Amino acid sequence: MLTPVDNPTAYGLVETDTDGNIRRFLEKPKPEEITTNNINAGIYILEPDTFDRIPSNVAWSIERSFFPSLIERHETFLAYVNRGYWIDIGTPEKYVQVHRDIMDRRFPALPFRDLAAPHAWIDSRARIEDGATIEGPCFIDEGVLVKPGARIGRYSVVGRQCHIEEDARVEGAIVWQNSRIGRDAALYDAVLGRNCHIGRSVSVNSGTVLGDRSALTDYTRV
């Protein structure tokens, strides 16, 4: 599958003929080499015998080895240009962006596709205690506990079994499952992995990415 982009220089450009046959790949072209704005979107439909051609026990790239061989042998190799939603989530910023796009319905994915604005999605097995504040759009998964005074703000994603302690704030952050956000802590546009522990009055600011099992002690600023 191909998709058009404004700037193909960061991607693999794909040239096709008028019938959709792929004629050339050009990885990260220079501006003067651009002949089309269609790039490789990374989605393929392969015949079963493709896997018989993949050598065993060696490093091998389907894009760099198999696809060029199809062109050289003039085998059937067709492209479909998708003009719908597509995003490269290879950076933390784009990873955050795709969640926001889903919540804003730029991409019609469940559960937000069928929700009325402001479409906060809260699993029936989550527990939002009295005095907590939820502002949509946001996503709160099963088993989440949000304690009094805590706030889950717009574009936040809170994974399964997370605990958000009293007066903590999650604003536009993505928090994977089984993490605990301590009292008075604040997360702003950050990404946290699984099983993280954020201590009391910790501040985690925009652009921060914490891996699985990260722990920040009380009053830390990152």
Task: Give the residues covered by each predicted segment.
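Catalytic-core segments of class I nucleotidyltransferases/pyrophosphorylases
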Residues: 6-8, 18-113
